[in-house]
Amino acid sequence: MSKESYELKAEARERVGKGSSRELRRNGLIPAVIYGDKQAPISIALSTNEVTKRIHAGGFMTTVGTIDVDGKKIKVLPKDYQLDPVRDFTMHVDFLRVSGNTLVNVEIPVHFENEEKSDIKIGGVLNIVRHTVEFHCPANDIPEAITVDLSGLKIGDSVHISNVKLPKNITPVIADRDFTIATIVAPAAGVEEETTEEASEE
């Protein structure tokens, strides 16, 4: 399941805008917003170091955390963050306010196992079409990843979402077709064709 929860301390922001955001960043803080759950959005400031540490720890987008805003604790799920394209530090984060029964759409990573029990062991190449899959799931019960078992797959075989054993309470956002997650191809054809395959599915 998703990684252990975390808590970040924040302060409410009264001033917003580019000038305010630049001032925050000079002081080691980043602007962020908490929205959703039929409540007014809250603009906040967070420690750049603490947020960056959480992002690099992994599982940031699939882990419910707590933000302490001037003493008020709010359960949140990160929905988006922006990185500086040059210096790779966090510039802004959007958080969704959640409760125990909140349903969310989350991109969940795909992990593969038992490659040695498939034709990959004789030279087949795993062509991954989807590295993540978007699911509907409860905010407090988000899987860390979904696992695809490659046992017995031959060159030319494909893995579709219907072949994957999914945890309880999660359903794919794409529900109108049995989309492909990966294929095993012959070595000569082992160039990833994600863009082509995805385009043909959309």
Swiss-Prot record:
The gene is rplY. It comes from Agrobacterium fabrum (strain C58 / ATCC 33970) (Agrobacterium tumefaciens (strain C58)). Residues 1-21 are annotated as: Disordered. Pfam families: Ribosomal_L25p (PF01386), Ribosomal_TL5_C (PF14693). Part of the 50S ribosomal subunit; part of the 5S rRNA/L5/L18/L25 subcomplex. Contacts the 5S rRNA. Binds to the 5S rRNA independently of L5 and L18. It comes from the Bacteria. The keyword Ubl conjugation does not apply. This is Large ribosomal subunit protein bL25. Keywords: Ribonucleoprotein, Ribosomal protein, RNA-binding, rRNA-binding.
